[in-house]
Amino acid sequence: MRASMFVLDQTVRYVAIIKRYKDGRKYYVVPGGKVEVHENIQQAAIREIAEELGLAIEQSDIFDSIIEKGNVFYFAKTNYSCLPLKIQGEEKERSHPHNSYEPMWLEWKQLSKLMVFPKYDYLQFEEIVSEIL
């Protein structure tokens, strides 16, 4: 099981995402990772966001979730206003010119046009985000 999280800024216009370049391919990744033995799925998602992006997410920030093919995607609305993101943790250590990680705030409506992993149902994503606008 993989724990991922869509982190939305305070305007609910932008989402934190990681642009990847690997072996000449460009794609995007929803921040997240594996669930460790001592934690539940939600704790794993919160930890991964802290490790990868340096963002502090509270349980109270999380307002919904969906499950897609062995992946749990949490949705968190934050008080962040698109502050600069820096890749951290294992991803920073593994980063080099042929395998790079570039965290960014992206207008969430653009996600439908991009190759994003892990795969998720964009229409369901849009419905969930639209409910809090």
Predicted segments with their positions:
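Charged phosphate-binding loop/patch that engages nucleotide di/tri-phosphates or the phosphate backbone
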Residues: 113-133
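A generic structural signal for ordered alpha-helices
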Residues: 23, 27, 89-92, 103, ...
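Sequence-level detector for tyrosine residue identity
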Residues: 14, 21, 27-28, 74, ...
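N-terminal strand-loop-strand
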Residues: 1-30, 57, 61
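Residue-level marker of intrinsically disordered, low-complexity segments enriched
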Residues: 15-16, 47, 85, 130
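Unchanged
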Residues: 35-117
